[in-house]
Amino acid sequence: MVSFGGLARKIFGSSNDRRVKTLRQRAEQITALEKNYENLTDEQLQAKTAEFRAALAEGKSLDSLLPDAFATAREAAKRVLGMRPFDVQLIGGMVLHERGIAEMRTGEGKTLMATLPVYLNALEGKGVHVVTVNDYLATRDAETMGRLYNFLGLTVGVIKHGLDDDERRAAYACDITYGTNNELGFDYLRDNMKYERAQMVQRPHNYAIVDEVDSILIDEARTPLIISGPLEDRSDFYNLIDTFIPPLAEEDYEVDEKQKTAIFTEVGTEKVEKLLEAAGHLKGESLYDIENVAVVHHLNNALRAHKLFQRDKDYIVRNDEIVIIDEFTGRMMPGRRYSEGLHQALEAKEHVTIQPENQTLASITFQNYFRMYNKLSGMTGTAATEAEEFGNIYGLEVLEIPTNLPVQRIDEDDEVYRTVEEKYRAIVRDIRASHEKGQPILVGTTSIEKSEQLAERLRREGIKGFQVLNARYHEQEAYIIAQAGVPGAVTIATNMAGRGTDIQLGGNLEMRVRQELSDVPEGPEREEKIAAIKADIAQLKEKALAAGGLYVLATERHESRRIDNQLRGRSGRQGDPGRSKFFLSLQDDLMRIFGSDRMDGMLQKLGLKEDEAIVHPWINKALEKAQKKVEARNFEIRKNLLKYDDVMNDQRKVIFEQRLEMMDEEDLTETVAEMRHEVIEDMVILRIPKDAYAEKWDIAGLKQDIASKLNLDLPVEEWAKEEGIAEEEFENRIKEAADKAAAEKAERFGPQIMTYVEKSVIMQSLDNLWREHLVNLDHLRSVVGFRGYAQRDPLNEYKTEAFELFQTMLANLREVVISQLMRVEIVGEAPPEPQLPPMAGLHIDGTTGENDFDEAIWAEHQHDDRIVPPAQRDPADPRTWGKVSRNEPCPCGSGKKYKHCHGAFE
């Protein structure tokens, strides 16, 4: 029976079809201009940029310039890159310009498509950011597409790990800036820890195109970017808490594998309360008293470490360290640590050295970072399954872009086996059969561990010449994945590895030229060798096509349909044939968690024998249903997290805006006077409550407050004896005395020095209190969920208490600032420049989950991001230097710039 909605779609087309139809008409208008642009000389084509900018200056809109700007960029691409954007790429480019997400199949040319809206929007001169998932892709795309932009008179910069502030500032000042989501986010956080606007590197956030948008805005949405600094060593406390968990019985806690939670039952809570009391760590009467917030937090972490995290699945122990394994890619992530004490709980569990916990100095989620852009768009091969989330959270509409040629890939039904062993035997048989007939095979696994297990099986079976993709550097990874289309190639890779690099049947010309001819200079010999490589690739492509094209063989389903679709999408690019198939077992995680017991019983009744598979569309539908459930749950988690993060985000905006205002202020006299008066008002109302009798006044306390907060000795006892004096008179007299003392100090210092001192004190105090506030919010967040048991809404409780904490922080700020300013005196030497605290930022690759810092250096020198004052550096010991700017004199005293001295060895 056909539903009414289905019938309507057949007659009128889906909303996606109708939108594509409208955009196709506009693409045809651009194509109609092609002949005119082909007739222009290079100089005339290049002059178009100035012409468009002049039109914008006269008030024309970007939309009105779109047809001509796209036609210009298309013609320039033909001349400079030898590539002509198809009409479907024009359609995708329009979607990106109109704040949408273009879902474009793998191999259809997303990178080239992006040049069209990038060129158009860069004409405004406000900056366009093209965001990729790793440094390799950012550099590659900036170099390749930079030729096109430079030809058209636009400047291009690239942000990558290892650049100093001057280099970053120059890259952000360009018309177009390529960079990773991590680098852009960290630069924003670092900028808002600087003390002068001139030190900042980023411009206002204008327009961003996010490549692999699903990976960045969905997969990484739960992981905030964090800049942190070390706290004191608390390893004894972690070890003590860890001893409480192993003796617990099953009735002491509840574990929900689906929800990934572990909580103490009432019985368990009583047990750990007694243990804490015996150890002298229980404050108050109950574990859940407010004084025990931090203890509860660490107990919950210890329980999660033991009951939710499995060794060799979620992490491995290597060289006396816990190394996290990424859940999406199965990759090890050296250098990355869980925050909020969870990593220390795992270290205590495995009895390795407990590293000091880090304090959050600044943090932001990708959700809130990218929502700062005036205009945001994205592109990916898989977004339709998450269209609702993109719409709800980012206001982005997903549009599926039709392929230039029909997709010929055959997606076969899943094969389901009863055990993992049976499944792997079938996989090896299938790989052997396809390999022997010369068909290239990409084998997708969910973890590095499983990749290695499969590789070992293939070795035992005598299958040789396969590649296992766990390269540490993205460039090597890109080369291996690019050659996965060679006839007979067997490439084992984790699901997301090598994303951003095409698998072309026969091999990748550009990669082979780079690999084989890197030392051959330009000239006839090089051209001859390139022609030979081209001919070889064409021949290999014919063989691969004859064998059926690329075969994507997946060894397990991921809990997200989107990750599965990404893997399938590696095959069948640009109309090539191909096939894909998933091999599953009832012991796989997804099957085990989502009702495989019932299915196992059914298969036994059907009399399924060993090594026999069940293949049926019903199985695919059942799995898809399970995946939809997981996706819906994950969406709810991310949506809920965003609601909590929005509370912090609103406060973050206030603090960062205040810092910017402070940087720009040339005279802070009025601001400081306001703060001083508010401190005095709070002080008086505390000690002399409104309308209270004189006997209730705390005059001794008021005198003490005036001395400690204002550094003044005032005769308040005498004032209190005066007839008819009220709190208002106290206020006015204290304000007058404090204002007079402040004015005298300002006169002694001089306006310039006074403003400098005020600015330094306010900003450093603000930063210190904000960091403490972030820790308080973390602890509040970790325990507020328990309010649900008392029938109170945890989110509302969090909002209320977070606001109270924020108000308290601002009151403390006023007191700290005024107390310091009323005491500060100038000594002979100039006051030191404000220094950033010791800090480190982890830069995690968006696709593979690896740390993009040089791992060896990062492991040995975790303090490299510290800003160390020159006076504290030992010329003979580079470990004391911290972060040194490339153009700074080398701290060793040689007189050379750092980059030409010790920096040359990095």
Swiss-Prot record:
Zn(2+) binds at residues 890, 892, 901-902. One of its GO terms (biological process) is intracellular protein transmembrane transport. CDD domains: DEXDc_SecA, SF2_C_secA. GO terms for molecular function: ATP binding; metal ion binding; protein-exporting ATPase activity. It is a peripheral membrane protein. Its EC number is 7.4.2.8. Part of the Sec protein translocase complex. Interacts with the SecYEG preprotein conducting channel. Has a central role in coupling the hydrolysis of ATP to the transfer of proteins into and across the cell membrane, serving both as a receptor for the preprotein-SecB complex and as an ATP-driven molecular motor driving the stepwise translocation of polypeptide chains across the membrane. Monomer and homodimer. Part of the essential Sec protein translocation apparatus which comprises SecA, SecYEG and auxiliary proteins SecDF-YajC and YidC. This is Protein translocase subunit SecA. It comes from Brucella canis (strain ATCC 23365 / NCTC 10854 / RM-666). The gene is secA.
